[in-house]
């Protein structure tokens, strides 16, 4: 351990206490890390012969040494400061004033030191000067005139923040004036990054001022710096489509400036005023930043504008990086056909444009969405044939593609288990290769294993993976938490719980089948891997009971093997509620009668004020919807409560054939748009028609009038109370959409519940008249209608009502594209009863050869 003497000395430059302690802390950390590393290496060498393991107690002992040393050093620096201020003026130099902060201190620090070793202040000062020389030019440091800002925001390069530095330069007197623009701009482009939009505007203004507004002198490095910072920005939530986006407009303004510079240069050449020494040029990096931000906005129009602009005006065609960005955009927008076309173009354009591993990983992600495992296998073979080195994410994506493809018997060609087995083989290969893993790869790896285990219905492994990942993340957050862990449990759990992990755990519950054996139990390597996770899960559950530092519990049943449907339903409900209530830190889903009455009273007054303040019904509706959203964010973990996870959660009782539990979950966690609008309208009209209590006190109303209207008023108030409770419960509900209506129809098919089928048919018909449905793209609306019609045909087929099923097909034959796969079950049923006439009509619709008999059938139905 290194120690430093900190007593008062001659010729010592004194820094402010906070700055001195900051630098000393960094220096000590550096030295301590080196000491630990040296000692650890010695311990490791010794452990080869002694089999000695470094225990947590040893690490804690070293950390205690560091804390004690830091406290001692802090006290000595404080004592030195006190001694200097009390009377040792002859042995010290006064603290640096604001005016003299940026004096050339190199001369001062170069005073001959007669002692052999420098004191701590000398080391701090020399380290500060050396690091500053690498961070900012000397002239910039002088104009910032605040070493504290530079040290605080720039010393940690992994978290450097240039915004305060740029803003400080913006308010300085000289800014960038009288600085060599070429040398300065080279440094600027490679250093200043991740500025907010207002700081980018300040930087652009100062650069223009530096060249006296001559846009011809605005060189390539300046353009690249500005575009790089613009490309790293994120669009605002209310402007995701890029319409009139301020960043897009700024990019176009810069391109107009460049066009103006080219025009001025051409005019100067024609007038023989001299050719500029260096004309700025547009680059591939600038194009990529334009495309990167356009894809964040999901703006196809802007992306096409930039590609066309650079190609036609500047002769710059998209390179490999640009095309990869375009493919990623297509992937996010579900434009898979365009993505495949662009990918094929890259392969056959030239060797410079040939896809790299990043592009292949993007295409594998598209294969996962399409459940196209044959194409994914072809892509992986291409990677090997072209000697492209796969990354960790490549193997993870292959496992995910095979897992998602195995979920459908038709897609998997009846080989679901084989696909999942192959997916595990890719993960084994990843483990054997020991490739570099980014910290995000651990999450992706856990998710890949969760996907494979979930689609396999392996509840035991899914529980273990979920528990181990959430426990690791929770304890890591607690270990690094700067606040009070007990007080901040709500925030910690919100950062810990993940919607993807919850969704795959719910999927494992939904695919529960005690008769099936996991695919991992079929070979030795799989058995070892599965036992490893189950063993860690079991030991973690036991050890956490004695962990007094960080208490961590998940509401799993205290049994290692779930073997009944009741257990699956109970545990899935517990885990679901635990996630929605943010790790048990909120009490939203279970409330007492007293609490419910308090909520009704509170929101009755609030809704009353909304109704009185609103100018019309639309304003009242907006206020209520805003309040519901606010209420939901305050009481529910909205990160995990989404339509995808809810869909999976509702599918559990369907697959387990538990109709009562399904209806309970559906009613408790969903609401319908038309019902919501009816309740809002009743409340608005009720508040408008019934005078407030204050108004009734002022008006003279006879006792007889009150008694006559009392029964009606009581009934109306009961209805209002019911409607207010409906609004209050929306905090844990999600609006029904086309996907959820399809799920309810699947439940009606599974349970053979005709009443449920009729209800969902009518409810969806009302939903089709609401704004959310009408706002959907027409092609999507038709596709959703066709999917629901197909489910209705399946329901009537299973009910044996073949005439009703055929009637649905005939009534929609001109609107929907009926294929044989959609009517296969109906066709088989008609063949079994030997209804040749209906079979012929059905096949005519599917094959679209002739609609004559179909029309005849319609005529017969109408006559009947």
Swiss-Prot record:
PANTHER family in alphabetical order: PENTATRICOPEPTIDE REPEAT-CONTAINING PROTEIN GUN1, CHLOROPLASTIC, PPR_LONG DOMAIN-CONTAINING PROTEIN
- Please tell me where this protein is predominantly located: mitochondrion
Query: Which InterPro entries does the UniProt entry name for this protein?
Result: Pentatricopeptide_rpt, TPR-like_helical_dom_sf
Instruction: Pinpoint the residue ranges of every PPR repeat in the record.
Output: 319-353, 356-390
Compartments reported by the entry? Mitochondrion
Family from the record: Belongs to the CCM1 family.
Transmembrane intervals: none
Disulfide bridges in this chain = none
Lineage of the organism: Eukaryota, Fungi, Dikarya, Ascomycota, Saccharomycotina
Q: What does this protein do?
A: Regulates mitochondrial small subunit maturation by controlling 15S rRNA 5'-end processing. Localizes to the 5' precursor of the 15S rRNA in a position that is subsequently occupied by mS47 in the mature yeast mtSSU. Uses structure and sequence-specific RNA recognition, binding to a single-stranded region of the precursor and specifically recognizing bases -6 to -1. The exchange of Ccm1 for mS47 is coupled to the irreversible removal of precursor rRNA that is accompanied by conformational changes of the mitoribosomal proteins uS5m and mS26.
Q: Which GO terms describe its cellular component?
A: mitochondrion
Q: What else is known?
A: Involved in mitochondrial-nuclear incompatibility, a major determinant in reproductive isolation between species, through hybrid incompatibility of Ccm1 and its interacting partner 15S rRNA between yeast species.
Q: Which UniProt keywords apply?
A: Mitochondrion, mRNA processing, mRNA splicing, Repeat, Transit peptide
How is the quaternary structure described? Answer: Binds to mitochondrial small subunit 15S rRNA.
The organelle transit peptide extends over: 1-76
Annotated GO biological processes are: mitochondria-nucleus signaling pathway; mRNA processing; RNA splicing
- Name under which the protein is recorded: Mitochondrial 15S rRNA processing factor CCM1
